[in-house]
Swiss-Prot record:
One term of GO molecular function: GTPase activator activity
Composition bias, Acidic residues: 161-170, 377-395
Coiled-coil stretches noted in the UniProt entry, renumbered to this chain: none
Gene: tif5
The organism of origin for this protein: Schizosaccharomyces pombe (strain 972 / ATCC 24843)
Signal sequence residues: none
Similarity section: Belongs to the eIF-2-beta/eIF-5 family.
Designated name of the protein: Probable eukaryotic translation initiation factor 5
Length: 395
């Protein structure tokens, strides 16, 4: 990752204070356009400030709403903003909330005086103590969200109690080692006979093997409410066609095939489609095929089938990538493939419609960060609408 001087006015290539160069990614279109800052957490870490402060500062300076999903490392500013513009604003943030007024080094630590609601800082480079200008809106955010205090172990290390604890631990360690040495030597067992290889390569190989054998699980006769056997056979044939031809065929060709088989309006076809063209580790896949899924998902039933297909895909691969569930659901939401209402219904309870109830519960638990964020975002939106209505009434 490219790095730059924290103080960009310093041209010294050996300047010790460095940070990642800000990256921006514009997503969506129209009223839903937004700017994502993928490396915000890395930048904030280099500056010694929470990502919340920097993101909110951008929002205040640009007059834009911000969205922060810390669990998924997503920091978003509404509107289209290029990296250069944001980098310039970051310089302003650094001058106002990071640099020491005395030595101009970025080695300051913030502290909050709860009594008078002021923000002061200590410079670890020169020892200067100063106060942050409280006129900027961000100071209110900092006071409400104070930086985490660093734990100090100095007094514990210097105290007699600490020495006694260290001595006790050493004595305990010696006893454990002595008793372990007296234990009889266990018979050596060949680990290769039973151990599960958890290395990254082995996990990837198992996922590929599971996906390769997915054709057997694509038979949808076990889905509730299946139609006649002849129609079910069409889904099987469609799944086999995808297995044989994808990724050699485009989304347009896939849609033409679905129309040819007269299943382009069927929710069960979406379940098959998700399992066949969404590949691990899944992030970015729904955005890649967004136009196709948007064309197919025209009702609540279709949207539920898309989520069901993703659940079944996770089950087929034994939940190996369950940690990406919040990111994938956010991607589905941001590409307008599933509505807020459907996500709310889906998240309300685990269902065994597409997978076992146990698997569904695990997926719902993994999805909790996304579902919580969605509920909070919905509440904020309703609150803003009510405020606008009140303003209109006042006029």
């Amino acid at each position: 990752m490219a790095t730059i001087n924290i103080r960009r006015d310093v041209k010294d290539s050996f300047y010790r204070y460095r940070m990642p160069k800000l990256q921006s990614k514009i997503e969506g279109k129209g009223n839903g356009i937004k700017t994502v800052i993928p490396n915000m957490s890395d930048i904030a870490k280099a500056l010694g400030r929470p990502p919340l402060y920097v993101t909110k500062f951008f929002g205040f300076e640009l007059g834009a709403q911000t969205t922060i999903i810390a669990d998924m490392d997503r920091y978003i500013v509404n509107g289209a903003h290029d990296a250069g513009k944001l980098q310039d604003l970051l310089d302003v943030f650094i001058r106002r909330f990071v640099l020491c007024a005395s030595c101009q080094n970025p080695e300051t630590e913030l502290s909050i005086n709860k009594k008078d609601q002021t923000i002061s800082y200590d410079c670890k480079a020169c020892g200067y103590r100063g106060v942050i200008d409280g006129r900027h809106k961000l100071t209110g955010v900092i006071v409400k969200n104070p930086p985490a205090k660093k734990k100090s172990h100095k007094h514990k290390r210097d105290s007699p109690v600490a020495e006694e604890e260290d001595g006790a631990e050493d004595e305990l360690t010696r006893r454990i080692r002595q008793e372990a040495a007296e234990l009889p030597t266990a018979e050596v067992v060949n680990d290769e006979d039973w151990a599960v290889d958890t290395s990254e390569e082995a996990v990837r190989a198992r996922v590929q093997e599971l996906e390769g054998n997915m054709k057997d699980s694509l038979t949808l006769s076990d889905l509730r409410g299946d139609e006649e056997e002849a129609e079910s056979s069409r889904y099987d044939q469609f799944g086999e066609w995808l297995e044989d031809n994808y990724p050699g065929v485009s989304d347009v060709e896939i849609y033409k095939k679905m129309k040819e088989e007269n299943i382009h309006h069927k929710s069960k076809a979406i379940v098959v489609l998700v399992q066949c063209i969404i590949t691990s580790p899944y992030v970015g896949e729904f955005e890649k095929h967004g136009a196709l899924f948007k064309k197919l998902c025209t009702t609540d039933k279709h949207e539920r089938a898309l989520l069901g297909g993703f659940e079944r895909l996770m089950e087929n691969t034994e939940l190996v990538h369950i940690d990406v569930v919040p990111k994938v659901l956010l991607e589905i939401y941001q590409n307008d493939l599933v509505s807020d209402d459907m996500f709310e219904k889906w998240g309300a309870k685990a269902s065994k419609k597409y997978v076992s109830r146990e698997t569904s519960k695990k997926i719902h638990e993994a999805a909790e960060p996304f579902l919580t964020w969605l509920a909070e975002a919905s509440d904020e939106s309703e609150s803003e609408d009510e405020e606008e209505e009140e303003e209109d009434d006042d006029e």
